[in-house]
Amino acid sequence: MSQGSIVQCIGAVVDIHFPRDAMPKVYDALKLDASEANGMAEDGLTFEVQQQLGDGVVRTIAMGSSDGLRRGMKVNNTGAGISVPVGMGTLGRIMDVLGRPIDEAGPIDSTELRVIHQPAPKFDELSSSVDLLETGIKVIDLICPFAKGGKVGLFGGAGVGKTVNMMELINNIAKQHAGLSVFAGVGERTREGNDFYHEMKDSNVLDKVAMVFGQMNEPPGNRLRVALTGLTMAERFRDDGRDILFFVDNIYRYTLAGTEVSALLGRMPSAVGYQPTLAEEMGRLQERITSTKVGSITSIQAVYVPADDLTDPSPATTFLHLDSTVVLSRDIASLGIYPAVDPLDSTSRQLDPQVVGEEHYSVARAVQMNLQRYKELRDIIAILGMDELSPEDKLAVSRARKIQRFLSQPFHVAEVFTGSPGKFVSLKETIKGFKGICAGEYDHLPEQAFYMVGGIEEVIEKAKTL
């Protein structure tokens, strides 16, 4: 085990000098020598090698606070990458980027360690599935259905409901789904991690979830690697032949941490100040989130959209890797329709008559057609009013407004705020309801009856009280 010494420290980037014949490899983990404990620097602080500068000097990223570091401190090379505990011992526990417990419940009961940098599965090991994953959320099941073993992105700007949607999906899928889940909190608020933990605990599914957090207050090195730590744990369960759910909140913060690290490493920024290696970093993470012939990983990722601009390089790079995209819209949220999913912008590869069936496909397209027609007529209505429309257009607008309201739904996780009990709507019920609206079976009901309800039966009941 070779030993080196710190020669330069700029924020989270630390340069360490080693003997020329014992230079660490890129991605090797280095540890601060125990003799350097001075009450200021973090005990056993880990560094990850990013670049070899030559002449025995390596440039590293500190996986923790670099406060208290000074030149000349001794650092040991572990000779391997960052390794984290994997397996059943991680379930029900909260860990940091290095796999250390942060829930004050004693050490992790796992003897097996795995390096966080792994190659993606080979092409001949991959498997594709066309089974649908029912979420119980009407707009998602109808317009952008999820595939088992697929990748889903929840796109949205600040405050349109990404995390609430993610929590509802966890609530509906993880609780129904008998398998295991891994949750990676990447650069999000600590409060959200705390809420998630208690939500899981109260619903007795904590023993089926492994949680890894690298929150907003952590150094960029932690936020950059925490997604890989969570993924490594999920891969281990998948390789045991299980079907895993992998939740990431938020992929954008992973990119942002990469931008910070890239700037500190002195790389030239590319478009909008992002790192030049953006596509490669995203690909390295996303290509590992996949299903093999042994087991599957279904991943649901929240993606923050800076300034509501979907063409920003970060969300645009993420789009390429996904099977379903759920786009949350500020315009829809401002109408008070939640979940604020934009049915005209959201897409899914599964929405194909050969996968979902002819009926589902035609109902989904009819819903989109009605909403698109309403969107086109909105300017005319704003200027001339409803009276100037032809009878056919009036009918189309009336149905579209009912569809728009029927796409809203009370969530279980938002019960505390809304006071109305959450609803899980089966796919069969969803298709039946929208098919009826498009066919004009409910033209006589007032549009208020369609707002914030579950199935179509509830609409009929609600209409009686209005």
Curated annotation (Swiss-Prot):
Record field: catalytic activity: ATP + H2O + 4 H(+)(in) = ADP + phosphate + 5 H(+)(out)
Binding site for ATP: G156, G157, A158, G159, V160, G161, K162, T163
Protein name: ATP synthase subunit beta
GO cellular component terms, A-Z: plasma membrane; proton-transporting ATP synthase complex
Quaternary data: F-type ATPases have 2 components, CF(1) - the catalytic core - and CF(0) - the membrane proton channel. CF(1) has five subunits: alpha(3), beta(3), gamma(1), delta(1), epsilon(1). CF(0) has three main subunits: a(1), b(2) and c(9-12). The alpha and beta chains form an alternating ring which encloses part of the gamma chain. CF(1) is attached to CF(0) by a central stalk formed by the gamma and epsilon chains, while a peripheral stalk is formed by the delta and b chains.
Main location: membrane
Enzyme Commission number(s) of this protein: 7.1.2.2
Keyword line: ATP synthesis, ATP-binding, Cell inner membrane, Cell membrane, CF(1), Hydrogen ion transport, Ion transport, Membrane, Nucleotide-binding, Translocase, Transport
Family statement: Belongs to the ATPase alpha/beta chains family.
Gene Ontology molecular functions: ATP binding; ATP hydrolysis activity; proton-transporting ATP synthase activity, rotational mechanism
EC class: translocase
Function of the protein: Produces ATP from ADP in the presence of a proton gradient across the membrane. The catalytic sites are hosted primarily by the beta subunits.
One Pfam family named in its UniProt record: ATP-synt_ab
Location of this chain's protein in the cell: Cell inner membrane
Membrane topology: Peripheral membrane protein
InterPro entries (UniProt xref): AAA+_ATPase, ATP-synt_VA_C, ATP_synth_F1_bsu, ATPase_a/bsu_AS, ATPase_alpha/beta_chains, ATPase_F1/V1/A1_a/bsu_N, ATPase_F1/V1/A1_a/bsu_N_sf, ATPase_F1/V1/A1_a/bsu_nucl-bd
